[in-house]
C-alpha cells in the first residue's frame, strides 16, 4: 500500500494529544530529546500559520518517577501526589523546549467538568482563544491533583476531543504507541487489517476497540474511538498515529501509517446547528435596526444595540435575538446573565465596568456563539405567528 501523505498545514487549528508513554520512561524519566523534536514540529506548523494546542499526558507518570513510587497501580492519594510533583516538571519541560523556537507556552489544567458546565466552558474557551491570539501554545492537562473520578476513570483522549470541540479545531491528532485502527488486535490476530480511512464511526468500528496499552498510559483504542465520536460529530477530523518517531508530526505529513477519521461537516456548521436547534431558549433580547444590520454582516451583538431583555437566563444559556418588529432573527449564547444584561442594555461597551463593577466581555452575544435563523427581508406570518428560520451561518 502506497504511503498516504497528510499535509497538516491545510488545517487552521489543531489539537495534539500526547500519551504518557511517549513523554516519560519508567526508569529514566522525561524523554527530553523526543520532546525537543516534537516542539520543532509544532514550530514548523506555527510558521505556516497553523494554531496548535497540546493536550499533554505525563504528569502522573513523571511524578511517580520523580517520587520513586513503586510499579503497579497507584492509590488515589498517590496519584494526586504524583500529579502535583509531575505537573511542575512537565510544564517546565514544555516551556523550555518551546522557548528554543521563541514560542511561549501557556499552562491550562482542566477536568471534564470544565468542558461541560457552561460557565466554566466559556471561561476556559475564552482563555485558550486569547492565548492563541497572542501566539502562545496552550499546554493542557487534566487537573489530576484535585480530580478524583478523572484519575480513576478519565483519560486525555476524550479530554482532547472535548477541547477540540470547545475551541472549534478542525483536526485532532492522537499520538501514542498505537499507529492506527485495525480490524482486530494485530498482536493477537495475524489476519487483522489496518484501516487507513474511517468515513463514519459505526457499531462495527466501535467493536474493534481494545484495552489500555501500559501502566503509564490510561488510554487505549476504546477511548480513542470515543474521542473520535466526540470530535467528528462536532465537525473535527481525527488522526490516530504513532508518536514513537522523534518527529511524529513530520512523519504523518511524510506518509507514516495513520488512521484518518472523517468529520461530519465543519466545526462552525456543527456548532451553529447545535445552537439553532435548541428548542426552548432561556430568554430573548430585542435589538434595534442598526444592530440587526451589524449581525447580518457577521458582527457580534454589542450592548449598545440592545433595547429589551426578557426572561431569566445565565451566561452561556441559549437566547433568542429579536429584531425591531419582534421577529426572531438569530439565536446565540448569552455573554451575560439576564440581570447584568438589563443593566447594560443600550450602553456603550466602555461603560460596562462602571455599571457592573467589573470589566465584562465586550459583546452581549459573540458572533462565534450566534447563528442567524431568519434570512434578511423575511416577513412575519399573518396573525403574528413566526416560523422558525433555517440555519444561516
Swiss-Prot record:
<keyword id="KW-0547">Nucleotide-binding</keyword>
<dbReference type="GO" id="GO:0005829">
    <property type="term" value="C:cytosol"/>
</dbReference>
<dbReference type="Pfam" id="PF01472">
    <property type="entry name" value="PUA"/>
</dbReference>
<feature type="binding site">
    <location>
        <begin position="176"/>
        <end position="177"/>
    </location>
    <ligand>
        <name>ATP</name>
    </ligand>
</feature>
<dbReference type="InterPro" id="IPR011529">
    <property type="entry name" value="Glu_5kinase"/>
</dbReference>
<dbReference type="GO" id="GO:0005524">
    <property type="term" value="F:ATP binding"/>
</dbReference>
<comment type="function">
    <text>Catalyzes the transfer of a phosphate group to glutamate to form L-glutamate 5-phosphate.</text>
</comment>
<keyword id="KW-0067">ATP-binding</keyword>
<feature type="binding site">
    <location>
        <position position="156"/>
    </location>
    <ligand>
        <name>substrate</name>
    </ligand>
</feature>
<dbReference type="InterPro" id="IPR001057">
    <property type="entry name" value="Glu/AcGlu_kinase"/>
</dbReference>
<dbReference type="InterPro" id="IPR002478">
    <property type="entry name" value="PUA"/>
</dbReference>
<dbReference type="GO" id="GO:0003723">
    <property type="term" value="F:RNA binding"/>
</dbReference>
<dbReference type="InterPro" id="IPR001048">
    <property type="entry name" value="Asp/Glu/Uridylate_kinase"/>
</dbReference>
<dbReference type="InterPro" id="IPR036393">
    <property type="entry name" value="AceGlu_kinase-like_sf"/>
</dbReference>
<comment type="pathway">
    <text>Amino-acid biosynthesis; L-proline biosynthesis; L-glutamate 5-semialdehyde from L-glutamate: step 1/2.</text>
</comment>
<dbReference type="InterPro" id="IPR041739">
    <property type="entry name" value="G5K_ProB"/>
</dbReference>
<dbReference type="GO" id="GO:0055129">
    <property type="term" value="P:L-proline biosynthetic process"/>
</dbReference>
<feature type="binding site">
    <location>
        <position position="17"/>
    </location>
    <ligand>
        <name>ATP</name>
    </ligand>
</feature>
<keyword id="KW-0808">Transferase</keyword>
<keyword id="KW-0028">Amino-acid biosynthesis</keyword>
<dbReference type="GO" id="GO:0004349">
    <property type="term" value="F:glutamate 5-kinase activity"/>
</dbReference>
<dbReference type="InterPro" id="IPR036974">
    <property type="entry name" value="PUA_sf"/>
</dbReference>
<feature type="compositionally biased region" description="Basic and acidic residues">
    <location>
        <begin position="379"/>
        <end position="393"/>
    </location>
</feature>
<dbReference type="InterPro" id="IPR015947">
    <property type="entry name" value="PUA-like_sf"/>
</dbReference>
<dbReference type="InterPro" id="IPR019797">
    <property type="entry name" value="Glutamate_5-kinase_CS"/>
</dbReference>
<dbReference type="Pfam" id="PF00696">
    <property type="entry name" value="AA_kinase"/>
</dbReference>
<protein>
    <recommendedName>
        <fullName>Glutamate 5-kinase</fullName>
        <ecNumber>2.7.2.11</ecNumber>
    </recommendedName>
</protein>
<comment type="similarity">
    <text>Belongs to the glutamate 5-kinase family.</text>
</comment>
<feature type="region of interest" description="Disordered">
    <location>
        <begin position="374"/>
        <end position="393"/>
    </location>
</feature>
<feature type="binding site">
    <location>
        <position position="144"/>
    </location>
    <ligand>
        <name>substrate</name>
    </ligand>
</feature>
<dbReference type="InterPro" id="IPR005715">
    <property type="entry name" value="Glu_5kinase/COase_Synthase"/>
</dbReference>
<keyword id="KW-0963">Cytoplasm</keyword>
<feature type="domain" description="PUA">
    <location>
        <begin position="282"/>
        <end position="359"/>
    </location>
</feature>
<keyword id="KW-0418">Kinase</keyword>
<feature type="binding site">
    <location>
        <position position="57"/>
    </location>
    <ligand>
        <name>substrate</name>
    </ligand>
</feature>
<keyword id="KW-0641">Proline biosynthesis</keyword>
Amino acid at each position: 500500500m502506497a504511503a498516504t501523505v497528510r499535509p497538516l498545514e491545510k488545517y487552521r487549528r489543531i489539537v495534539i494529544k500526547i500519551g504518557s508513554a511517549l513523554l516519560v520512561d519508567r526508569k529514566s524519566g522525561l524523554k527530553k530529546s523526543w520532546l525537543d523534536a516534537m516542539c520543532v514540529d509544532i514550530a514548523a506548523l506555527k510558521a505556516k500559520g497553523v494554531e496548535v494546542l497540546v493536550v499533554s499526558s505525563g504528569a502522573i507518570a513523571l511524578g511517580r518517577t520523580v517520587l520513586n513510587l513503586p510499579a503497579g497501580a497507584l492509590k488515589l492519594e498517590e496519584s494526586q501526589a504524583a500529579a502535583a510533583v509531575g505537573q511542575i516538571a512537565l510544564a517546565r519541560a514544555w516551556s523550555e523546549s518551546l522557548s528554543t523556537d521563541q514560542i511561549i507556552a501557556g499552562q491550562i489544567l482542566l477536568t471534564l467538568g470544565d468542558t461541560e458546565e457552561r460557565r466554566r466552558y466559556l471561561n476556559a474557551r475564552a482563555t485558550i482563544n486569547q492565548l492563541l491570539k497572542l501566539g502562545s501554545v496552550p499546554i493542557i492537562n487534566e487537573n489530576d491533583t484535585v480530580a478524583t473520578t478523572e484519575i480513576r476513570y478519565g483519560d486525555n483522549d476524550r479530554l482532547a476531543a472535548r477541547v477540540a470541540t470547545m475551541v472549534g479545531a478542525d483536526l485532532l491528532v492522537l499520538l501514542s504507541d498505537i499507529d492506527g485502527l485495525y480490524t482486530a488486535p494485530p498482536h493477537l490476530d495475524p489476519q487483522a487489517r489496518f484501516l487507513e480511512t474511517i468515513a463514519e464511526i459505526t457499531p462495527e468500528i466501535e467493536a474493534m476497540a481494545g484495552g489500555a496499552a501500559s501502566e503509564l498510559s490510561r488510554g487505549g483504542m476504546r477511548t480513542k474511538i470515543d474521542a473520535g465520536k466526540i470530535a467528528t460529530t462536532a465537525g473535527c477530523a481525527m488522526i490516530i498515529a504513532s508518536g514513537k518517531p522523534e518527529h511524529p508530526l513530520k512523519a504523518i505529513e511524510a506518509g507514516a501509517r495513520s488512521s484518518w477519521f472523517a468529520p461530519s461537516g465543519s466545526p462552525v456548521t456543527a456548532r451553529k446547528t447545535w445552537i439553532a436547534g435548541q428548542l426552548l431558549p432561556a430568554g430573548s433580547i430585542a435589538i434595534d435596526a442598526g444592530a440587526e444590520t451589524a449581525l447580518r454582516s457577521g458582527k457580534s451583538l454589542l450592548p449598545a444595540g440592545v433595547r429589551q431583555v426578557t426572561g431569566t437566563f445565565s451566561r452561556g444559556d441559549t437566547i433568542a435575538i429579536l429584531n425591531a418588529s419582534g421577529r426572531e432573527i438569530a439565536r446565540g449564547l448569552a455573554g451575560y446573565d439576564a440581570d447584568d444584561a438589563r443593566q447594560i442594555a443600550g450602553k456603550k461597551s466602555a461603560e460596562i465596568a462602571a455599571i457592573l463593577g467589573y470589566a465584562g466581555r465586550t459583546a452581549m452575544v459573540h458572533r462565534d456563539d450566534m447563528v442567524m435563523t431568519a434570512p434578511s427581508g423575511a416577513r412575519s406570518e399573518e396573525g403574528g405567528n413566526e416560523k422558525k428560520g433555517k440555519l444561516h451561518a
